[in-house]
């Protein structure tokens, strides 16, 4: 082995920030990008405009923040760690970039979000799923988001029907947005290095969003992906599934003041609806977003709803 050179501490205003002097809390997902080339690539792929207001989550020591401030109109950085807040402010203090930076302290999942055009973030991995959900339900919709995730999570976001990573998450996100893998990032590009590699994904919300009752949509997908390799007919013949659907059916009929047939056979109604829809022998792992939309419509026409 060759000699290991000593790592020099860098000043807070340098291109990499004062990362050596700050202890990082990896339990909170604090892993700082140390490679300027990767930081520059993320900013380049973000295609920011000079008029953009950018929402950044978890700026850390500000490596990505500073580069975005050089391009965008404003960067609103949301950070929960007071030490990191002080560090990112120090990076731009006394420079022309200072007036372009706004730092919001606190938990980004609990705070009210400001208006922003684009979201660019190296996200704490623990909040990946709830953050994406909040992003896609935020109004007004941003133009897009460029987000760093654990590679395993990113693979699920971009998975297509038939892929091993295709899941309820894939369908939910792809209903509301166009998703694209932009680049992969090795774990060694971070300090301290996480246990797994990462990936950068572009999420562009569909605007306007599809006219879907998301409570029902989520209820349907939850059932379909109970056993994503089984046929839908096999899943919807399960007694506990039939029981839930019949309970919802009775609630809907009561709400509509519609009489419930005395000889109601919910299993038969479900089987006939699935057969007529053409999806009875389909498996969730191979169904497209459009297929689930058509299936939900077929069920709704038969007064079958997914309320819980």
From Swiss-Prot:
Coiled-coil residue windows:
none
- Keywords noted in UniProt: Methyltransferase, Nucleus, RNA-binding, rRNA processing, S-adenosyl-L-methionine, Transferase
Could you tell me which InterPro entries the record lists for this protein? KsgA/Erm, rRNA_Ade_Mease_Trfase_CS, rRNA_Ade_methylase_Trfase_N, rRNA_adenine_dimethylase, SAM-dependent_MTases_sf
Q: Tell me, which GO biological process terms does this entry list? A: ribosomal small subunit biogenesis; rRNA methylation
- Compositional bias (Basic residues) at which positions? 1-11
UniProt superkingdom: Eukaryota
Q: What is the reaction catalyzed? A: adenosine(1779)/adenosine(1780) in 18S rRNA + 4 S-adenosyl-L-methionine = N(6)-dimethyladenosine(1779)/N(6)-dimethyladenosine(1780) in 18S rRNA + 4 S-adenosyl-L-homocysteine + 4 H(+)
Q: Which Gene3D superfamilies match?
A: 1.10.8.480, Vaccinia Virus protein VP39 (3.40.50.150)
- Any idea which positions bind S-adenosyl-L-methionine? 31, 33, 58, 79, 107, 122
Give Gene Ontology CC terms.
nucleolus; small-subunit processome
Its EC number(s): 2.1.1.183
List the biased-composition ranges (Polar residues).
Answer: 12-24
* Gene Ontology molecular function, alphabetical: 18S rRNA (adenine(1779)-N(6)/adenine(1780)-N(6))-dimethyltransferase activity; RNA binding; rRNA (adenine-N6,N6-)-dimethyltransferase activity
Record's keyword annotation contains Transferase: yes
Region of interest (Disordered), residue spans: 1-24
Q: Which PROSITE patterns match?
A: RRNA_A_DIMETH, SAM_RNA_A_N6_MT
Give one Pfam family, short name only: RrnaAD
**Where is it located?**
Nucleus, Nucleolus
Role summary? Specifically dimethylates two adjacent adenosines in the loop of a conserved hairpin near the 3'-end of 18S rRNA in the 40S particle. Involved in the pre-rRNA processing steps leading to small-subunit rRNA production independently of its RNA-modifying catalytic activity. Part of the small subunit (SSU) processome, first precursor of the small eukaryotic ribosomal subunit.
The annotated subunit structure for this chain is:
Part of the small subunit (SSU) processome, composed of more than 70 proteins and the RNA chaperone small nucleolar RNA (snoRNA) U3.
The family assignment reads: Belongs to the class I-like SAM-binding methyltransferase superfamily. rRNA adenine N(6)-methyltransferase family.
What PANTHER family does the record tag this protein with?
Answer: DIMETHYLADENOSINE TRANSFERASE, DIMETHYLADENOSINE TRANSFERASE-RELATED
The name on file for this protein is: Probable dimethyladenosine transferase
